[in-house]
């Protein structure tokens, strides 16, 4: 299985598993490090999609999937280095 397919399957499975939890979380329950992580994500997604018309159309979906994935990873680790490694792995 190639890396792209592996990443896609990971994100799809994660999205299904975490979507309801994500929507139940209240804004104030996401702590400061998770909010910082979301800012990093927004910046990464912007950099990755700014020159690509195809990705521009998918930016919102990509942002939702990456945010879900990274919040899920981060809430279980609370280790920023591990989380940044995971972001690199799931980023296009």
From Swiss-Prot:
UniProt record similarity statement: Belongs to the rotavirus A NSP6 family.
UniProt entry keywords in alphabetical sequence: Host cytoplasm, Host mitochondrion
Top-level taxon of origin: Viruses
Main subcellular localisation: host cell
Compartment list: Host cytoplasm; Host mitochondrion
InterPro entries: Rotavirus_NSP6
Organism: Rotavirus A (strain RVA/Pig/Mexico/YM/1983/G11P9[7]) (RV-A)
Kinase listed as a keyword: no
Cellular component terms per the entry's GO annotation: host cell mitochondrion
Subunit structure: Interacts with NSP2 and NSP5.
Protein name stated in the entry: Non-structural protein 6
Family annotation (Pfam families): Rota_NS6
UniProt key word Lipid biosynthesis: no
């Amino acid at each position: 299985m190639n890396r792209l397919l592996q990443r896609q399957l990971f994100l799809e499975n994660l999205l299904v598993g975490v979507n309801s939890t994500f929507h139940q979380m209240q804004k104030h329950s996401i702590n400061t490090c998770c909010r910082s992580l979301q800012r990093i994500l927004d910046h990464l997604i912007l950099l990755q999609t700014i020159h690509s018309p195809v990705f521009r159309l998918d930016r919102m979906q990509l942002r939702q999937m990456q945010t879900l994935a990274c919040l899920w990873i981060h809430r279980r680790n609370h280790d920023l280095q591990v989380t940044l490694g995971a972001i690199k792995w799931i980023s296009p």
